[in-house]
Amino acid sequence: MKLHNVLKNNNNNKEDVGPSIEQFGGNAEWFNTTKVLSECLPYIQQFSGETFVIKYGGAAMTDRKLAESFAHDIVLLKQLGINPIVVHGGGNKINSFLEKINKKSTFINGLRVTDAETLEVVEMVLCGLVNKDITQLINKAGGNAIGLCGKDANLIEAKKVCYTYKENQSNNVEKILDMGFVGEPHEVNTDLLFFIEESDFIPVIAPVCSGENNITYNVNADLVAGALANALAAAKLIILTNVSGVTDANGNLLSEISVSDAENLIEQGVANSGMIPKLQTCIKVVKEGYGSAHIIDGRIPHVLLLELFTVHGTGTMVLGNDI
């Protein structure tokens, strides 16, 4: 039934109580939609003109419907006046190609040990296959995405990472493990990113960077996203994962945690494997930056919009120690 007919019928009644949900065929979804839209308004007003750095990875990349949902969300953010910068991983694709050449991977604290042969595969997969697929999806959704890697225009300069560990806890002697061509962000060319934002493009960045003597490094995408968020004074860093968020020792989701809480989760071994660089990145962004950091479940369709524009949100937000 059309809205004007509903109102007309109501005017013929002795007691005008207004149109009811039943008069719309009992479809409460219409009303819920308008409620959600009105709920978005204060967040849109708050973040218009701000920069969001979004680390994209996990199931949101491997599931095509989730990938298309993510692309639409990125375009919507841009249309709302927010400047999204996408940094992507691609671990599953890298693993798949390494398996084809019978190459095994070793991970230490969530970082892939990278020799010369592995580096070639990483650069080929991330900068070629994965990066271009993401830009194509965003462009198909109506955006203007441009694919980059850390090497382009010296966007991100990296330095070599060395992992220290104690072989024997009794003698307290630390040893250095060579991670190969694994780097960490050192400097960011913010001028290029500001230029891209002003040109109405959406940058999509692969975490392959160069360092001293033009050596190429494989850099963890979480660390790259964090470095960009700090360098650009981004309002938010958002990391998509394959889990619901950060959990405590009992597996309960933590909707908000302080920097101290995050540090304790790492020290106590509650956070492990790939969650370690994610939390470390969030800690650094909150300590050194101006915004908040979020770890959210990329398996949920339109999870970005749920986290950013609804009262309850989803996942885990990392805030300063004064929460």
Curated annotation (Swiss-Prot):
Family the entry assigns: Belongs to the acetylglutamate kinase family. ArgB subfamily.
Pathway(s) per entry: Amino-acid biosynthesis; L-arginine biosynthesis; N(2)-acetyl-L-ornithine from L-glutamate: step 2/4
Annotated catalysed reactions: N-acetyl-L-glutamate + ATP = N-acetyl-L-glutamyl 5-phosphate + ADP
EC number: 2.7.2.8
Protein name per UniProt: Acetylglutamate kinase
PANTHER family listed in its UniProt record: N-ACETYLGLUTAMATE SYNTHASE, N-ACETYLGLUTAMATE SYNTHASE, MITOCHONDRIAL
Gene3D superfamilies with a match to the protein in the record: Acetylglutamate kinase-like (3.40.1160.10)
TM stretches of this protein: none
UniProt-annotated binding residues for substrate: 90-91, 112, 218
Keyword Secreted among UniProt keywords: no
Main location: cytoplasm
Top-level taxon of origin: Bacteria
CC terms in the record's Gene Ontology section: cytoplasm
Localization annotation: Cytoplasm
Positions marked as site (Transition state stabilizer): 55, 278
Alphabetized UniProt keyword annotations: Amino-acid biosynthesis, Arginine biosynthesis, ATP-binding, Cytoplasm, Kinase, Nucleotide-binding, Transferase
Chain's role: Catalyzes the ATP-dependent phosphorylation of N-acetyl-L-glutamate.
InterPro entries, per database record: AceGlu_kinase-like_sf, AcgluKinase_fam, ArgB, Asp/Glu/Uridylate_kinase, NAGK-C
GO molecular function terms noted in the UniProt entry: acetylglutamate kinase activity; ATP binding
One Pfam entry name: AA_kinase
GO terms for biological process, alphabetical: arginine biosynthetic process via ornithine; L-arginine biosynthetic process
